[in-house]
Structure formats: C-alpha cells, structure tokens
C-alpha cells in the first residue's frame, strides 16, 4: 500500500508514533530501537508495511528497508504474526537476528518476548536457507568513539542541512566504518550511500 511515508513525527509513544503528512496523522507501530532513535517534531522517512486483519488495519514502520524485509520474512514463518516479529526486532538488530538464525542461536532468539524454544527452532528451520543465500553483515565501526568524534558529528549535521533524513544519516554513521576518514570523505561516502537508497 505505502512503501514509505515522509513526514514530521508529532507524537512518540511506547510502541507507536504519529507521523503527520499533508495534514494527516498516521499511527504507525514501531520497534523499540526505532522509538529510541527518533524525536518529536523532526522529519523522518519511515518505511512501512500495511497489515490488514479481521479486527483491525495496522501500519508498521521501520527505519530501513532491511528491517522491513526481515519483518516480512518473520511474519511468513508459521505461527509468527506481526506482534512477535516486532518483539524480535525490538530485542535485536537486523544483523543480530540474521546471524542468530544462520548460527542456530536459539538462546538469542528466545530473548524476544513471546518467543520460546519451539518458535525459535521453527524460525531457524524456515528462514535459515533463505537468509544464508545473500546475507552480508553491515560494516561496523572498529572504534565506537569514532562515530562520536567531531568529524563524524560535523558530517552528520552537514548531511542533515543538505536535506537527508535523520534516521538515514544516523543509520549510515552507526553501520559504516568511518575510522580514519576525513570529513570530506565521510560526506562523499555518505552521500553515495544515501543517494543510492532513495
């Protein structure tokens, strides 16, 4: 129905946000990770998935296409509905979840509320082969201090001034190794990555 919605977050609640676009407020259910990284009255690009049930029509929101794709994979698993999929994505990152599935890490998967050993085993059984085929872990910063450095913060602010969305910029800095790069190089790398995902 909607691939994504660009708008201003007017409300942030425990498990959903209200995103205003063209004077319409969309109630969008989100993961804990997403909630903890957004601020009211900022503009965001929210990737969405519309789920229609007998008793309700619900819009789920994600910070990236990768997160939405994993949500859809999880909801395809027998007995895993949107609620449990969101619980999993609120407990671990996309890469952590995929790695847990590939390495048969039942212990990690069962950390998600409502996911027992039987359910975790079913997730691994049904998704392992699908995920193994094309899973490439995101680059991680070798030094967590790097992304908090003056250079990365300056580049972040500059990218926001250029009109890139906060969640996209933050995701780039979080998931990309920018150690040793100059501000100019960070900007070039970020713009190339962000432009290709638009």
Curated annotation (Swiss-Prot):
Residue ranges of the region described as Domain II: 64-142
InterPro entries: DNA_helicase_Holl-junc_RuvA_I, Hlx-hairpin-Hlx_DNA-bd_motif, NA-bd_OB-fold, RuvA, RuvA_2-like, RuvA_C_sf
SMART domains according to UniProt: HhH1
One Pfam entry name: HHH_5
Entry GO CC: cytoplasm; Holliday junction resolvase complex
Keyword DNA-binding: yes
Flexible linker: annotated segments: 143-153
Subcellular localization(s) per the UniProt record: Cytoplasm
Region of interest called Domain I, as start-end residue ranges on this chain: 1-63
GO molecular function term, any single one: ATP binding
Its biological purpose: The RuvA-RuvB-RuvC complex processes Holliday junction (HJ) DNA during genetic recombination and DNA repair, while the RuvA-RuvB complex plays an important role in the rescue of blocked DNA replication forks via replication fork reversal (RFR). RuvA specifically binds to HJ cruciform DNA, conferring on it an open structure. The RuvB hexamer acts as an ATP-dependent pump, pulling dsDNA into and through the RuvAB complex. HJ branch migration allows RuvC to scan DNA until it finds its consensus sequence, where it cleaves and resolves the cruciform DNA.
Summary of subunit composition and partner proteins: Homotetramer. Forms an RuvA(8)-RuvB(12)-Holliday junction (HJ) complex. HJ DNA is sandwiched between 2 RuvA tetramers; dsDNA enters through RuvA and exits via RuvB. An RuvB hexamer assembles on each DNA strand where it exits the tetramer. Each RuvB hexamer is contacted by two RuvA subunits (via domain III) on 2 adjacent RuvB subunits; this complex drives branch migration. In the full resolvosome a probable DNA-RuvA(4)-RuvB(12)-RuvC(2) complex forms which resolves the HJ.
Domain comment in the entry: Has three domains with a flexible linker between the domains II and III and assumes an 'L' shape. Domain III is highly mobile and contacts RuvB.
Protein name: Holliday junction branch migration complex subunit RuvA
Protein species of origin: Finegoldia magna (strain ATCC 29328 / DSM 20472 / WAL 2508) (Peptostreptococcus magnus)
Gene from which this protein is expressed: ruvA
